[in-house]
């Protein structure tokens, strides 16, 4: 018996049902890699960031997330080179979906009990996504803006429902506005740290502040 179509599990009807000691025998999620491209690129190398944002409250299967990841990665490698971007899938499939297997052969009514004891066995995993939640993000150089939009547009076709593409006003994957970012780094209020930054507040021990600005 094949996998049941994901349209059967599209809507968030039940409470979150994660893998636990009570919910065992869950098959592994299809998506294993959540970061692709040049993951270790410094924060100042990729200022542009594009998001795919969900416009529906629904469930996205791990197979769909994997398909979208592959699709976006393939296009970005072709258009920007394998070291010209960093893709991050922002959803993780933790919700377990179940299936109550029914026999469809002759004499099945003698072998099974129909809807008696209909709590199913784990079949796979899905990610629950809210309206306005980011599904996937890509950071890259400013000249690759059109490529980011096209990569996310192609990846959208792998998902049910409606998604929007949003070019962020923030710098890369950080939470700071792009127009203020370079000034804050120059003032040493932000310290680059891998693909993120450390924020140095204006309060705290004076000795620390003096050591930083000396």
UniProtKB/Swiss-Prot annotation:
Gene Ontology molecular functions: structural constituent of ribosome; translation regulator activity
Oligomer and partners: Component of the large ribosomal subunit. Mature ribosomes consist of a small (40S) and a large (60S) subunit. The 40S subunit contains about 33 different proteins and 1 molecule of RNA (18S). The 60S subunit contains about 49 different proteins and 3 molecules of RNA (28S, 5.8S and 5S).
Glycyl lysine isopeptide (Lys-Gly) (interchain with G-Cter in ubiquitin) crosslink location in chain: 188
Encoding gene (name): Rpl10
Keywords associated with the record: Citrullination, Cytoplasm, Developmental protein, Isopeptide bond, Ribonucleoprotein, Ribosomal protein, Ubl conjugation
Tagged with keyword Calcium: no
Localization (cell): Cytoplasm
GO biological process: embryonic brain development; liver regeneration; negative regulation of apoptotic process; negative regulation of transcription by RNA polymerase II; regulation of translation; translation
Family indicated by similarity: Belongs to the universal ribosomal protein uL16 family.
InterPro entries documented for this protein: Ribosomal_uL16, Ribosomal_uL16_CS_euk_arc, Ribosomal_uL16_dom, Ribosomal_uL16_euk_arch, Ribosomal_uL16_sf
UniProt-recorded name of the protein: Large ribosomal subunit protein uL16
Coiled-coil regions, chain positions: none
An annotated GO cellular component: cytosolic ribosome
Function recorded in the entry: Component of the large ribosomal subunit. Plays a role in the formation of actively translating ribosomes. May play a role in the embryonic brain development.
PTM per Swiss-Prot/TrEMBL: Citrullinated by PADI4. Ufmylated by UFL1.
Covalent cross-link Glycyl lysine isopeptide (Lys-Gly) (interchain with G-Cter in SUMO2) as placed by the record, residue numbers: 175
Pfam families documented for this protein: Ribosomal_L16 (PF00252)
Organism: Rattus norvegicus
Sites of Citrulline modification: 32
């Amino acid at each position: 018996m094949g996998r049941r179509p994901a349209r059967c599990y599209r809507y968030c009807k039940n409470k979150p049902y994660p893998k636990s000691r009570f919910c065992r025998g869950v098959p592994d999620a299809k998506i294993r890699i959540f970061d692709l491209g040049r993951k270790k690129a410094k924060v100042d190398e990729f200022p542009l960031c594009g998001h795919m944002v969900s416009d529906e409250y629904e469930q996205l299967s791990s197979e769909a997330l994997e398909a979208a990841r592959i699709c976006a990665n393939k296009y970005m490698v072709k258009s920007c080179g394998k070291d010209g971007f960093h893709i991050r899938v922002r959803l993780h499939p933790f919700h377990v979906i179940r299936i109550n297997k029914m026999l469809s052969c002759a004499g099945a009514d003698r072998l099974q009990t129909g809807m008696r004891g209909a709590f199913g066995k784990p079949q796979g995993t899905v990610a629950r996504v809210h309206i306005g939640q980011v599904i996937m993000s890509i950071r890259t150089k400013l000249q690759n803006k059109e490529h980011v939009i096209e990569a996310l547009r192609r990846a959208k076709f792998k998902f049910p429902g409606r998604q929007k593409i949003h070019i962020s006003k923030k710098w890369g994957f950080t939470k700071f506005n792009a127009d203020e970012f370079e000034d804050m780094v120059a003032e040493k209020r932000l310290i680059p740290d891998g693909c993120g930054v450390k924020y140095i507040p204006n309060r705290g021990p004076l000795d620390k502040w003096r050591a930083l600005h000396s």
